[in-house]
Each structure stands twice: as C-alpha cells, then as structure tokens.
C-alpha cells in the first residue's frame, strides 16, 4: 500500500512538471520569462555575435577541416574559444558589471581556452603547418577584448596584425601551389575584421553590461555560463528538455530503491539501532588524549586530497625535452640544446632554413648559404653563419650573440633582451629592424678589431606643423 501511494505521488509530480514545461514552451520567443531577476532571451548584441560565428568562424572551420591535421585540431579549439566568448557575452547581456574581485574568475574559461590554443602550437613546433598554428596562436589573445577599455577595437586590430606576420609566410609558401591555404588565410583574417566591426557597433568603448539585471558574480554568472542555451553556437536557444529525461530520472530512482528500503528498515529500528555501536573508551577520545590531538593536527581531510587535480595539467612545462638537431624537409631543426658548443650544420642548400628553438648556453655554426635563420625562445646562445640570402630573426630571446662571416641583407630583433651582432666587411649594408627589444649592439670591424655601436632604444617625437618627426634620443656617455 505504501509503495502504491509513493508511485501515485511520483506520477502527480511528473504530470505537474509536464504541465509547467508545456506552458513555458508556448511563451513568445522574444521573452522567455524571468528567473532570479534575469530576463531570459537573446540580446541584439548576442544575436550579432551569433551571426559572426555562423558566418566567419564557420567558414574558417570549414577551410581548416579541408586542410585537416594540426590545422583542423587547432581550429576546433578556436571554435570552442568563441563558444566560451559567446557564453560570456550572454552573461553580460543579462547581468550587471561584476565587482572587480570577481572579474578574473569570470574570465577564466576564456583565458583557459586561449592558453590551450597557444600550448598546442608550442607542442607542435615540428609541424609542417607551423606558420598556420603560429598565426592563430599569436592573434587568439584578441578574444581578451572583453577586458579592454576604452578601445577594445584597436586591441583586436593589433592582434590581427600579429597574425599577418605568419599568414604572409603561408601565402608566400602556397599562393602559387595550393589555393586552399590562401582561402584559409582569408577566412581567418576575416574573423578579426568582422569582430572589429562587431565591437564598433555594440561595444565601442568596452564590453556593455546589462543595466537592469543582478550584479554578476562567480555564483550567479556561472549558472548562466553552464546553462544549455548559452553554450551552443547556433543563434536560437535550445528548447526546454522534454519528458524523456524526466522519466529517466524516475527510473534511476527506482533502481536505487533496494538500498533506500534497507535504509528505511534501519531507521525503523528506532532506539534499537544503537545496539550495534561500539563503546569508545577514554583513550580513544580526542579531547581526553593529547597524542590523538597531535595526530589530528597532521591529518589531512580526505576531501582535500583530490583538490590538486585541477592544477595537474599545468605540469607539462617542466617536462624535459630531448635535444634535436636534424633536417626535416627543407628545415634544419635545432631544439632544446643545452651547454653545447660543438653544434655544426655543414651540409646546407640555398632553399633550406634553420629554426633554433629553446636552446641555452650553446653555440651553433651554420656553414654555406641558407635561405633564413630563426632564433626563438633561446638564452645565452651564440650563432655563427656564413651567408643568408633572406633574413635572420631573433624572437623572444635573451643574451644572443651573432657573428656574420659573409653576407646577410636583414636582421630582425623582436621582444629580445640583449643582442650583440658582429658584422663582417661584406655585411656592412645589412639592415637591422628592431621592436620591443633592449640592450642591442652592432659591432663593426675596424683596424683588425671591432667597434661597438648601440641600437637606440629611446626616441623623441615632435610635431613640425604638418607631421610627426621621430628621431633617436641622443644619450651622451
């Protein structure tokens, strides 16, 4: 009889839920009601972002799937990052601007997606699509525009410019051989162009928050971020769940009924249930035994033993990589070399390039003539080479010394602290291009020795009545 009564009550609850769901499904699409002070529905700014995803992002994803491999995998990550941004914009359209202390936590889902994209590039430096991965990795921080004020649009443009450095390389390699890569470049750059236009129309001076909803917080906002309608890319929100999940849950409750019946049987014993308890003596009581209190202070809570797991993915930077010195296609890869001063590349060809990555306290000699040399993320590295027909680039490095034995037309220094370049007599017409770097010196041969000339790091700019005039600031020793 009791089981029958319980079944009737469950059926009544199920019917009640079905009626409420049916009533909600017939509401007008523009206004889906109000929950906890938040009016559901999609704001015009979110709808506009959905159009961007359905057009530009979808086109980029399609072209990436055509190229497949690492490019496709990377593009899926980009798509996921845009989904996270869409969820954040949905939250902003329903909640007021959060307190400053909550901003970092609310931005964490997007920042983690950006980090994932950049990490993928770092882990696949040997990929033959490395320029594609670099274009995405260098520009994906543009999604951080939601935290930029008062001019988020120019920030996105700056990130777009960072991408063009690598997309130009892609175009150079494939514009005459495989137009699929050209389409890929166009579709990717179009994303950021359209995002700038979107920001200009809906968030000109910074992210626009709701004026009427409750204040966003790590509690209330995450309920929106984790809800079904806010995450998928298509514009229309998903309808409320139908009856099948309801009865699935009921079925799961029935599966657990034996254990629940056993629990009720124990409870029905009343005071007799205490007969199974064991008597605790004074030496087993913490408040009467000082030694137990000392042990208790050292005992960790079992619930805390699982907390380190979320941080475990961050352990990968400490991995020890095997040193690499090999020719892969037309690229010489010199990676993860430490305390090596005997590295020599002698069998070179004009079309080959050398890529030197994450090398420390080492010296590398490249003989013959190569197309270009790139030094990336290196420390205390010495490079000696004969001839380069293209460019020598130094990026994100520290304490680099370069000696030119023959000729090189251009040397580029970017985001580097400490770079000393020894030019030969034949390389005095070399052009040095530098940006965001310091402690740069050019050493010119004179009378059998070298004379050092610092590259300016400080500039002064003045208005001459018609244009800006910029020149190095003279610093007298």
Swiss-Prot record:
Gene3D superfamilies referenced in this protein's UniProt entry, alphabetically: 2.160.20.70, Adenylate cyclase-associated CAP, N-terminal domain
Keyword Phosphoprotein: yes
Biased composition (Pro residues): 230-246
Domain C-CAP/cofactor C-like residue range list: 317-455
Subcellular localization: Cell membrane
Keyword Phosphoprotein in record: yes
UniProt membrane topology term: Peripheral membrane protein
Low complexity: bias regions: 298-320
One of the record's GO cellular component terms: plasma membrane
InterPro entries, per database record: Adenylate_cyclase-assoc_CAP, Adenylate_cyclase-assoc_CAP_C, Adenylate_cyclase-assoc_CAP_N, C-CAP_CF_C-like, CAP/MinC_C, CAP_C_sf, CAP_CS_C, CAP_CS_N
GO biological process, one term: cell morphogenesis
MF term (GO), any: identical protein binding
Domain of life: Eukaryota
Sequence segments annotated as region (Disordered): 225-261, 274-321
Alphabetized PROSITE patterns for the sequence: C_CAP_COFACTOR_C, CAP_1, CAP_2
Functional description taken from the UniProt entry: Involved in the regulation of actin polymerization.
Protein family: Belongs to the CAP family.
Protein name from the UniProt record: Adenylyl cyclase-associated protein 2
Organism: Homo sapiens (Human)
